[in-house]
Amino acid sequence: MSMKTVLCAVDISNDNRDVGVLKQAARLAEMEGAQLDVITVVPDFGMSVVGAFFDKGHHDKMVAEARTRLDDLVNTALGDGASDDQRHVVATGSAYEEILKIADTIKAELIVIGAHKPDFSDYLLGPNAARVVRHSSCSVYVVRS
């Protein structure tokens, strides 16, 4: 099976903890000669009670900051200028839902995602990685951090 697209999901809020995830995704994409797309998801406060506390342009600022941090993460993990070779997606909403939606949109054959060791809350709520694995229509490679 030859892959054309690998989607790597990273969390930019965890101080470069996903560098290893991104490096593994890049290795897999390179081995297959596949396009590497990198996604991060920012929360959608929208019309929630929390959203009422932010000014109108706050979401746009969050997305712009996320894009900058995503570029920085890619360059840190893969070397300066590496971010020019990948497509970057900053989505808004629920992390696992947006990852699955983008994977379907780009017809990814593989999703690479990081997972931390579960704690008690993960058993009640379910971590994003587990939800992606459970609901994905393509293969998922989980990198333990």
Where are these regions (language model features)?
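Structural beta-alpha unit
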Residues: 1, 76-111, 118
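Short, flexible loop segments at boundaries between secondary-structure elements
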Residues: 135-145
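A short acidic, glycine-rich active-site loop
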Residues: 56-69
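Short secondary-structure boundary segments
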Residues: 10, 114-116, 144-145
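Glycine-rich, Arg-bearing micro-motifs that act as flexible, cationic patches
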Residues: 110-131
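Short, hinge-like loop/turn segments at secondary-structure boundaries
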Residues: 54-57, 105-106, 129-131
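Small/aliphatic-rich secondary-structure junction motif
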Residues: 2-52
